[in-house]
């Protein structure tokens, strides 16, 4: 079973970090509820977040502000199963939402399995990924009744070490990865872990 996770271009990651440092305002919605095109998911993110989805127009001014090729970024999102890329200014975190499909022989009864079984299943996924180290796997149940496996992730993106906290859940044959990434490559601090949990806790499914 080979699971492909989203990869970013170095240019986009650098541009997003620059936006935080420069306090670029505004390409986010006024409402803090974000409907993610292409997947039946809504998230609550702070107003003022910078948000990219697959439906961001290729000629949107956001790409000019970031000084990146909008067509290339959107192609990258589609190629790598990435449905949302959002940057928060306070705290300085990047959030991504990825959905991939599991092979039919790798399905698990997510709702009825024991916590240890869920962690073991997710750890088996991580073992097959390159440049990824996961630890501190645990199960988190949100107020929405969604069960997640939560893990701390040490990875590499274009030769740069990244630290993140990832929440994984499965619905049917679909795996959803919600990842909160330290924007500057530093280890997440306690308040940032709490914030990632808050965002995961606000995730809602609006359909099957």
Predicted segments with their positions:
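Bacterial N-terminal signal peptides that target proteins for export
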Residues: 2-13
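Bacterial N-terminal signal peptides
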Residues: 13-23
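Sec/Tat signal peptide C-region and signal peptidase I cleavage site
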Residues: 24-28
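Proline-anchored loop/turn motifs at beta-strand termini and strand-loop-strand connectors
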Residues: 37-59
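Surface-exposed amphipathic alpha-helical segments
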Residues: 49, 175-208
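Conserved polar/disulfide-associated segments of primarily extracytoplasmic proteins
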Residues: 57-165
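A short, structured loop/turn motif at beta-sheet edges
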Residues: 139-147, 170-173, 207-208
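A short, solvent-exposed beta-edge/loop patch
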Residues: 163-177
């Amino acid at each position: 079973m080979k699971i492909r996770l989203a990869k970013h271009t170095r240019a986009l990651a650098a541009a997003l970090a620059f936006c935080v440092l420069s306090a670029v305002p505004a390409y986010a919605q006024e409402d803090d509820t974000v409907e993610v095109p292409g997947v039946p998911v809504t998230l609550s993110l702070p107003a003022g977040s910078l948000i990219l989805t697959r439906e961001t127009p290729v000629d949107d001014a956001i790409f000019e502000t970031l000084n990146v090729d909008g067509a290339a970024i959107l192609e990258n999102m589609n190629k790598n199963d990435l449905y949302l890329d959002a940057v928060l200014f306070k705290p300085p975190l990047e959030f991504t939402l990825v959905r991939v499909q599991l092979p039919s022989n790798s399905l698990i009864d997510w709702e009825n399995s024991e916590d240890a079984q869920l962690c073991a299943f997710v750890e088996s996924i991580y073992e097959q990924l390159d440049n990824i180290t996961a630890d501190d796997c645990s199960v988190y149940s949100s107020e929405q009744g969604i069960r997640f496996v939560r893990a701390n992730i040490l990875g590499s993106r274009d030769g740069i070490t990244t630290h993140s906290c990832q929440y994984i859940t499965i619905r049917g044959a679909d795996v959803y990865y919600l990842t909160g990434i330290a924007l500057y490559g530093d280890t997440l601090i306690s308040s940032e872990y709490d914030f990632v949990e808050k965002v995961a806790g606000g995730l809602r499914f609006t359909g099957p």
